[in-house]
Design a protein with these regions (language model features):
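Outer membrane beta-barrel
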Residues: 3, 18-121, 133-151, 174, ...
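Outer-membrane beta-barrel pore domains
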Residues: 5-19, 50-54, 67-69, 144-149, ...
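Short, solvent-exposed loop/turn segments at conserved positions within beta-propeller repeat blades
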Residues: 130-134, 164
């Protein structure tokens, strides 16, 4: 299986710029035994920002997953979206266990593939060099009853600032209203403040209506979300908004996706973010079309 996504992003404000690229992904999987399987994903990213049309191809996923009794085990390089993605949504080289039926829990230990911006610099070739360990321990709890889902998580990013860990606690939930509407929110708390104003908290809440389904022509979805997060409350945020220079952000995002025809889906998003501890401001227009096969 696979997908091809063509994307254009335009940013005005502090991080002014644009991105235009084509991302192609191919998924490979095989059964190792009755209980275990291997999964890999090969990704090619071709940038159209310059006349060079630069391209790179890498294995972005390579992991094994299976069951050991009542415990699900995953190990290798895989994508880990924790909770609502407001703290971490990125690739990780690690090991994860999931268990529980009514009250579900998970524990993971590994090294985020995206590194640690607090301990990084660009070398002469433009490569990101990380100067310290960026291992992390992440544990989660999820509980669903009726239309309500509760989730909580604890993150410990080691040696995140100097020799100190960044420890983040989150608690959140969602409510399904019928089959089409979902309200969701999350509170976040860190053990240190990244900005001089002393803030170390965050809150995110939003609404989703329906959602585009690639196999269902004419299906669509609408979402809106409000964000207010200190820089210490996220490591690799799930948002598509550009906010690199804001060092924490306060603002909103809205989006609309639509299935044009079977396996062809379009997405348009808009974000308006203010910097938490600066006069910086970013407005992001994101648009893409994804072909699945």
């Amino acid at each position: 299986t696979g997908e091809a996504r063509t994307r254009y992003v335009d940013v005005t404000g502090t991080d002014k710029g644009y991105m235009a690229d084509l991302r192609t992904r191919l998924w490979l999987s095989g059964q190792v035994s009755d209980d275990w399987r291997y999964v890999a994903m090969l990704e090619n990213l071709q940038s159209f920002n310059t006349n060079k049309e630069e391209s790179e191809t890498k294995f972005r996923r390579a992991y094994v997953t299976g069951n050991a009794g009542d415990i699900k085990v995953t190990g290798g390089r895989y994508n880990y979206t924790v909770g609502q993605g407001n703290v971490f949504d990125d690739g990780i080289d690690g090991v994860q266990i999931d268990f529980g039926k009514v009250l579900k829990a998970s524990m993971a230990y590994g090294r985020p593939a995206g590194g640690n911006d607090f301990h990084s610099f660009q070398d002469a070739g433009g490569n990101t060099i990380y100067t310290k360990n960026n291992d992390a321990f992440i544990t989660t709890l999820d509980y669903k009853t009726g239309n309500f889902t509760f989730n909580a998580a604890f993150y410990d990013f080691l040696d995140y600032v100097g020799n100190a860990d960044n420890k983040i606690w989150t608690v959140g939930g969602s409510i399904d209203i019928g089959d089409t509407v979902k309200l969701h929110g999350e509170y976040l708390k860190s053990n240190f403040a990244a900005n001089t104003d002393g803030e170390d908290e965050g809150i995110v809440f939003g609404l989703n209506y329906k959602g585009a389904e690639p196999e269902k022509k004419g299906s669509y979805g609408i979402w809106a979300k409000y964000y207010n997060q200190d820089r210490s409350t996220y490591v690799s945020h799930t948002t598509d908004a550009v906010h690199d220079s804001l060092w924490g952000f306060d603002g909103y995002g809205v989006g609309f996706d639509y299935t044009i025809t079977k396996n062809i889906t379009a997405l348009v998003e808009y974000f308006d973010f203010n910097g938490k501890n600066s006069e910086g401001k970013d407005k992001t227009w994101w648009s893409d079309v994804t072909f699945t096969f």
